[in-house]
């Protein structure tokens, strides 16, 4: 009986993994279907010109969909942005915060709000893309074959439907597959660009444009970078939590001590993504609109990759968003109240405000270290990419996302296997009884 259960749970895990892989293949297939009315030759020259801007970063996150202007050009970014906005609003807007506390029903309503906001954001972004494409004229001609109202409408509908389809596919992976669907879609997009980035680097080395020693150093650096990211992402501060003893009849229960883990990098990959988006927007706007404005020219120059102003602002924004997002993810006051509700306490700290202040003190120190770690991981590859023409797919932000998704998926697989074994053990105990 135990063997049959183990075999059944193993087959279930395999079916989940196969389902996830099939959905990701569909996502990759869709990234090669272009939107109607685009001159692919003219578009490719524009994509090459904007490889280092925010366009390049979003193109990397979308697995090249934006550069090819496919139906998945907006990727799943509008959904992520909408989810973050709803999360921010739930902190500032009391009715939304109360809605989140209503259990499964409240969660479904919040998710529905995220979907509505996704449609709105995707519509605005799609219209902006359509207008921008119509304004671009290259040496080979305009990017849009037949500009006008019909092109704008079809582009908006196509891109919004593409984003919503990706969102739905991501939800299917989360529910019926393994891992977080949204993260895995971004993950597969980044991974798809790594082989071409490596081939391009060795091609430059073969032609003499890049030293073979530098190419080898980059490969070794990537391995070291991954090891550093794994170390810091797994690092955590464990706080001792004590539960009081309870007497029921003649027996005494409880009194055990557990640990509350606080991650060193609580904010994850959000700070670098937000910081890059803000800093690279002016340069990308100038490239997209073919603007010759002196102000735009200065912004493009000073906010270019590797420039001192860019690096300083980049680090400052990463630190800011590290603190900002950590405050959203971990609510010290709410956690302290929950501990008090269950009778738990931190040894040496009074329940309530004293415990909340202690959490803030620990989190502040952890966030400073986490922010410095994110800054170093993102800035050093940034400087190298600026000097040695290396693809964004080999940058710090991309590896942060990839490593985080792999670690999260592996944890889910381990949890699934452990829970399956536990259920099998409980069934054996019931049969014996």
Swiss-Prot record:
UniProt keyword Metal-binding present: no
SUPFAM superfamilies attached to this UniProt entry: Preprotein translocase SecY subunit
Pfam families noted in UniProt: SecY (PF00344)
Source domain of life: Bacteria
Topology within the bilayer: Multi-pass membrane protein
Protein location: Cell inner membrane
Membrane-spanning ranges: 17-37, 71-91, 117-137, 141-161, 184-204, 212-232, 268-288, 310-330, 366-386, 388-408
Gene Ontology cellular-component terms listed: plasma membrane
InterPro entries: SecY, SecY/SEC61-alpha, SecY_CS, SecY_dom_sf
Primary location: membrane
Gene Ontology biological process: intracellular protein transmembrane transport; protein targeting; protein transport by the Sec complex
Keywords, alphabetical: Cell inner membrane, Cell membrane, Membrane, Protein transport, Translocation, Transmembrane, Transmembrane helix, Transport
NCBIfam families according to UniProt: 3a0501s007
Family: Belongs to the SecY/SEC61-alpha family.
Biological role: The central subunit of the protein translocation channel SecYEG. Consists of two halves formed by TMs 1-5 and 6-10. These two domains form a lateral gate at the front which open onto the bilayer between TMs 2 and 7, and are clamped together by SecE at the back. The channel is closed by both a pore ring composed of hydrophobic SecY resides and a short helix (helix 2A) on the extracellular side of the membrane which forms a plug. The plug probably moves laterally to allow the channel to open. The ring and the pore may move independently.
Quaternary structure annotation from Swiss-Prot or TrEMBL: Component of the Sec protein translocase complex. Heterotrimer consisting of SecY, SecE and SecG subunits. The heterotrimers can form oligomers, although 1 heterotrimer is thought to be able to translocate proteins. Interacts with the ribosome. Interacts with SecDF, and other proteins may be involved. Interacts with SecA.
Name by which UniProt lists this protein: Protein translocase subunit SecY
Biological source species: Rickettsia felis (strain ATCC VR-1525 / URRWXCal2)
């Amino acid at each position: 009986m135990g063997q049959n259960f183990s075999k059944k749970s193993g087959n279930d895990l395999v079916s989940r993994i196969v389902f996830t892989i099939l959905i990701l293949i569909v996502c990759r297939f869709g990234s090669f279907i272009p939107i109607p009315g685009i001159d692919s030759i003219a578009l490719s020259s524009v994509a090459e010109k904007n490889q280092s801007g925010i366009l390049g970063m979003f193109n990397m996150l979308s697995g090249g969909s934006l550069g090819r202007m496919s139906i998945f050009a907006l990727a799943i970014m509008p959904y992520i942005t909408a989810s973050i906005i709803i999360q921010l609003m739930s902190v500032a807007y009391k009715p939304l915060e109360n809605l989140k506390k209503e259990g499964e029903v409240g969660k479904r309503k919040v998710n529905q709000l995220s979907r509505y906001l996704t449609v709105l954001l995707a519509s605005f972004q799609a219209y902006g893309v359509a207008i921008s494409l119509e304004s671009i004229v290259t040496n080979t001609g305009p990017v849009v074959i037949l500009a006008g109202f019909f092109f704008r409408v079809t582009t908006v509908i196509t891109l919004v439907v593409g984003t919503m389809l990706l969102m739905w596919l991501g939800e299917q992976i989360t529910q019926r597959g393994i891992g977080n669907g949204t993260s895995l879609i971004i993950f597969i997009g980044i991974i798809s660009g790594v082989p071409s980035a490596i081939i391009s680097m060795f091609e430059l080395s073969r032609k003499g444009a890049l030293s073979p020693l530098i190419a080898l150093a980059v490969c070794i650096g990537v391995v070291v970078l991954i090891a550093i990211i794994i170390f810091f992402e797994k690092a955590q501060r464990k706080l001792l939590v004590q539960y009081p003893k309870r007497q029921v009849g003649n027996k005494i229960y409880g009194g055990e001590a557990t640990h509350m883990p606080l991650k060193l990098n609580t904010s994850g990959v959000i700070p670098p993504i937000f910081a890059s988006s803000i800093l690279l927007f002016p340069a990308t706007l100038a490239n997209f609109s073919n603007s010759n404005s002196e102000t735009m020219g200065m912004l493009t120059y000073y906010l270019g990759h590797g420039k001192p102003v860019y690096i300083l602002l980049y680090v400052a924004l990463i630190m800011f968003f590290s603190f900002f997002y950590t405050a959203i993810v971990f609510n010290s006051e709410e956690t302290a109240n929950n501990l008090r509700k269950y009778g738990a306490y931190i040894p040496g700290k009074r329940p309530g405000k004293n415990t909340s202040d202690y959490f803030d003190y620990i989190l502040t120190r952890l966030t400073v270290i986490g922010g410095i770690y994110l800054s170093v991981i993102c800035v050093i590859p940034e400087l190298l990419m600026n000097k040695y023409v290396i693809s964004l797919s080999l940058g710090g932000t991309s590896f942060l996302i990839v490593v985080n998704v792999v670690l999260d998926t592996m944890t889910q697989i381990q949890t699934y296997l452990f829970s399956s074994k536990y259920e099998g053990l409980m069934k054996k105990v019931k049969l014996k009884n």
